[in-house]
C-alpha cells in the first residue's frame, strides 16, 4: 500500500501491479540435492525454495554477506549438495562459485521472475500499455 501511494503521488492514475519475485533456474536442476543461495530475506527464502522443482536441502539467504556465506559453506547440509543454485551477485561469484569450483559442485545460476500477486492485473499487459504510451509520447 505504501508503494502504491508513493507511485500515485508522482504518477497519478498510473496502473500498478504488485508482484513477487520467483526463482527461475537458468537450466534444469535435475534429481540431485540443491543448495539455494538467494538475496531474499530469511522469512521469504524458504517459501521461494519450496516453489523450485528440486530436492532443496539447504537455503542460504545471505548473498551480500561474504562471511555468512563462508559460514554457510561449512555447514554439512550445504556442503553435501550436488548443485548450488545461485543468484548472480558479486559475493556469490567470489565466495560460492569459487568454493563450488574447488569442490566439484555444479553451479546453476538463478534469475528472479516477477509474478503478479493473486488478484493483481496482468503484468505483461500493463507493461505493454506503458510501453505504448511511452512510444506515443515520442511520436
Enumerate the predicted regions with their spans.
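GTPase G-domain guanine-specificity segment
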Residues: 1-11
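P-loop NTP-binding site
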Residues: 11-139
